[in-house]
């Protein structure tokens, strides 16, 4: 795999968890809170041809990315709720590549997922912003990754995930002068 491909896949680098701090918590919470507006701005004024352009060779189209983030963050919302209400629950993985090929992703306009993201992130922010430092230590089990993850880890991962996909779109726009 070439360096260019790696950079295009991970334009902001890989996710790296950070130790708990109030400063980091505020930063990640702001990432969650403002993500819907960031992705909406990233796709603003793109035409159908641009929306159907893969962000890299072999990658998803912008259209698929927007729907993927909605799918992923719906799962995140449920994972936080499960982690807060159950003792170390095993979360349900999903086949994101297959989900990206389903009828809703292929046929519905992105404004459906953009609207969903605004509502979803308002709810997720309300839950996560009220988690105590002790509650952030609660865990979920991800069977596909074979590991136990704290809610703190999940907060950082989903804050990163949103920025990661916004960067896919904005870097594509920059490369193509859109």
Predicted segment positions?
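Acidic/His metal-coordination segments adjacent to aromatic residues that form catalytic metal sites
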Residues: 20, 99-112, 144-153
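Short, contiguous, helix-prone interaction/anchoring segments in small proteins
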Residues: 20-56
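A generic "alpha-helical surface" signal
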Residues: 26, 30-33, 63, 67, ...
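A short secondary-structure junction motif
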Residues: 42, 46-49, 87, 131-134, ...
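Alpha-helix initiation and capping sites
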Residues: 29, 33, 45, 56-63, ...
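Acidic/histidine-rich alpha-helical segments that form the ligand environment
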Residues: 30-42, 100-137
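Short leucine-rich amphipathic alpha-helices used at interfaces
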Residues: 22, 28-29, 113-114, 164, ...
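Short, contiguous alpha-helical
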Residues: 1-16, 52-97, 125, 137-178
């Amino acid at each position: 795999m070439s360096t260019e491909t790696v950079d295009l896949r991970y334009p902001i680098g890989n996710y790296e968890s950070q130790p708990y701090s109030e400063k980091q918590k505020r930063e990640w919470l702001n990432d969650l809170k403002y993500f819907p507006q960031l992705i909406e701005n990233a796709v603003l004024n793109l035409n159908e041809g641009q929306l159907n352009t893969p962000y890299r060779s072999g990658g998803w189209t912008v259209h698929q990315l927007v729907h993927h983030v909605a799918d992923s963050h719906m799962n995140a919302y449920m994972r936080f709720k499960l982690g807060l209400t159950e003792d170390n629950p095993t979360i349900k993985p999903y086949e994101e590549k297959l989900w990206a090929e389903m009828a809703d992703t292929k046929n519905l306009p992105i404004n459906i997922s953009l609207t969903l993201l605004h509502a979803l992130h308002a709810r997720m922010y309300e839950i996560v912003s009220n988690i105590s430092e002790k509650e952030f230590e609660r865990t979920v089990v991800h069977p596909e990754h074979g590991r136990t993850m704290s809610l703190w880890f999940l907060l950082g991962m989903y804050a990163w995930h949103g920025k990661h996909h916004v960067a896919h779109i904005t870097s594509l726009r920059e490369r193509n002068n859109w």
